[in-house]
Amino acid sequence: MEFDPAKINTSSIDHVTILQYIDEPNDIRLPVCIIRNINNITYFINITKINPDLANQFRAWKKRIAGRDYMTNLSRDTGIQQSKLTETIRNCQKNRNIYGLYIHYNLVINVVIDWITDVIVQSILRGLVNWYIANNTYNPNTPNSTTISELDIIKILDKYEDVYRVSKEKECGICYEVVYSKRLENDRYFGLLDSCNHIFCITCINIWHRTRRETGASDNCPICRTRFRNITMSKFYKLVN
């Protein structure tokens, strides 16, 4: 099932954005609550509202060696203290629509999403998170934001155009399909490894990552076998600064 942004209802309570993905014909109602941190740099997602079992699984995973190592590496890579990678909004009458455990979006996309057994919900969740981030990366009303000149805008557009031109020709190193030509829109994203520059579509590298984890194997690049820690979902073949 292809992700459809037209099926998103957006609302907010206090500092929490609530995305409701509603697909009545397919009996799908997926709520995703998102908090942007005070610097508007990163995002935290409520996994309790997606499924209460996910919060319990996450707490158990965080206590295991793999979880502790992942949290340590994520804290180092993001510069965020481990204690700040999660946030809890308590359950009370005022917060009944937004309470729960919020965790850094990297943990959702690279860890928690693999615990969801329904592949349709997986796909929709990934699409929702990506859609929200893509539409909220720059907010001209953010306090202390820097004014961008017309010349700066032209330079930015030129840079993105160059990266897009290269990206649209790139093939996944696993399925050998051109990433931008894949049938499903949600598959037309790159999965960037933090250890090397090999090219993969997000779907193939996530399947590889999940399979390696299930078999107890190391998280190694399928091509060069260099060990990686994180997978970043990106519309381009490389990160654009």
Curated annotation (Swiss-Prot):
GO terms for molecular function: acid-amino acid ligase activity; ubiquitin protein ligase activity; zinc ion binding. One of its GO terms (cellular component) is host cell cytoplasm. GO terms for biological process: protein polyubiquitination; symbiont-mediated perturbation of host apoptosis; symbiont-mediated perturbation of host ubiquitin-like protein modification. It catalyses: S-ubiquitinyl-[E2 ubiquitin-conjugating enzyme]-L-cysteine + [acceptor protein]-L-lysine = [E2 ubiquitin-conjugating enzyme]-L-cysteine + N(6)-ubiquitinyl-[acceptor protein]-L-lysine. The keyword Metal-binding applies. It is an enzyme of class 2 (transferase). Residues 21-131 form the KilA-N domain. Keywords: Host cytoplasm, Host-virus interaction, Metal-binding, Modulation of host cell apoptosis by virus, Modulation of host ubiquitin pathway by viral E3 ligase, Modulation of host ubiquitin pathway by virus, Transferase, Ubl conjugation pathway, Zinc, Zinc-finger. It comes from the Viruses. InterPro entries: E3_ubiquitin-prot_ligase_p28, KilA/APSES_HTH, KilA_N, MKRN-like, Znf_RING, Znf_RING/FYVE/PHD, Znf_RING_CS. A zinc finger (RING-type) spans 172-225. The keyword Transmembrane helix does not apply. Its EC number is 2.3.2.27. It holds the Pfam family zf-RING_2. Its main location: host cell. It is found in: Host cytoplasm. Belongs to the orthopoxvirus OPG021 family. RING-finger E3 ubiquitin ligase which catalyzes the formation of both 'Lys-48'- and 'Lys-63'-linked polyubiquitin chains. Plays an important role in virulence by acting as an anti-apoptotic factor. The RING-type zinc finger domain is required for E3 ligase activity. This is Host range factor p28. It comes from Ectromelia virus (strain Moscow).
